[in-house]
A protein has these predicted regions:
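Conserved, mostly hydrophobic/aromatic
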Residues: 8, 39, 47, 92, ...
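Conserved anion-binding
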Residues: 19-23, 98-171
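Glycine-rich, proline-tolerant flexible connector loops at the mouths of alpha/beta enzymes
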Residues: 46-62, 104, 165-175
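Conserved beta-strand positions in the central sheet of alpha/beta enzyme cores
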Residues: 48-51, 78, 101-102, 125, ...
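Glycine/small-residue-rich loop that forms an oxyanion/phosphate-binding "nest" at active or ligand-binding sites
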Residues: 53, 61-117
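Charged helix-capping and loop-helix junction motifs
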Residues: 60-67, 141-150, 175-183
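Catalytic cores of alpha/beta
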Residues: 73, 77-96, 180-215
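Glycine-rich phosphate-binding active-site loops on the catalytic face of alpha/beta enzymes
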Residues: 94-112, 198-201, 211-229
Length: 237
């Protein structure tokens, strides 16, 4: 199983939100490039980046930081946040990003998603935020009437290869992952499923690996010291 340590970006800084609430933000580092280098030093091969400002506004606000991480590490970078048209998607790819994650747009603009997958293939992934089994959109502020299962069916039909699945009732709350949900989705669909949100212990990582999940994202648990990245990478391997 592949581990993706994560950096959420606001104003060029590495931050974390509590349960997706922009008012409850903790700044962990003023230098995200050095954080990314620490990931690499610990043995990580990939990382997950989210431009939280772009997730809200649709305008890439941390492009310089993302480019600097791409230029100063050998990590495979996946980036999400506000990718709502081809121009923004291709801007991210031009910064040296290996995979761009479509979130809100995958729900609200299926035509764009279809074109993006046709043009860029597996350089395009989809990030879905789930709240109580339904898809949430617009930086977690709205819930749609689309169930997780119906959403995955659509993605599979469109040829999406990778879906990052976040249970936002658990994200950043250190409550442990929603194992039942991930297990059901990974058994039913042939999509590479990356679990995100609430991965708070080595036990979580071991359990997700046992389910045969493609990957898992580690956020807050790394920054608080609840998970040692080196150990986590060993367990996932």
């Amino acid at each position: 199983m592949i581990l993706y340590p994560a950096i959420d970006l606001v104003g060029g800084k590495a931050v974390r939100l509590y349960k997706g609430d922009y008012a409850q933000m903790t700044v962990y580092s003023d230098d995200p490039v050095s954080v990314a280098k620490e990931f690499q030093k610990a043995g990580a091969k990939r990382m997950h980046l989210v431009d939280l400002e772009a997730a809200k506004s649709g305008i890439p606000a941390n492009a310089d930081t993302i480019r600097a991480i791409a230029e100063n590490t050998d990590l495979f970078l996946e980036v999400g946040g506000g990718i709502r048209n081809m121009e923004i998607l291709e801007t991210y790819l031009s910064l040296g990003v290996d995979r761009a994650i479509l979130g809100t747009a995958a729900v609200t603009d299926p035509q764009f998603l279809k074109e993006a997958v046709e043009k860029h293939g597996d350089k395009v992934a989809v990030g879905v935020d789930l709240k109580d089994g339904f898809v949430a959109i617009k930086g977690w502020t709205e819930t749609s009437n689309l169930t997780a299962e119906a959403f995955f069916e659509k993605m599979q039909a469109l040829g999406v290869k990778t879906v990052i699945c976040t249970d936002i009732s658990r994200d950043g709350a250190m409550k442990g992952t929603n194992r039942e949900l991930y297990k059901a989705l990974s058994e039913k669909f042939s999509i590479d499923l990356i679990a995100s949100g609430g991965v708070s212990s080595i036990d979580d990582i071991a359990a997700l690996k046992e389910m045969g999940l493609h990957g898992a994202i580690i956020g807050k648990a790394y920054y608080t010291g609840a998970i040692d990245l080196k150990e986590a990478l060993e367990v996932a391997r």
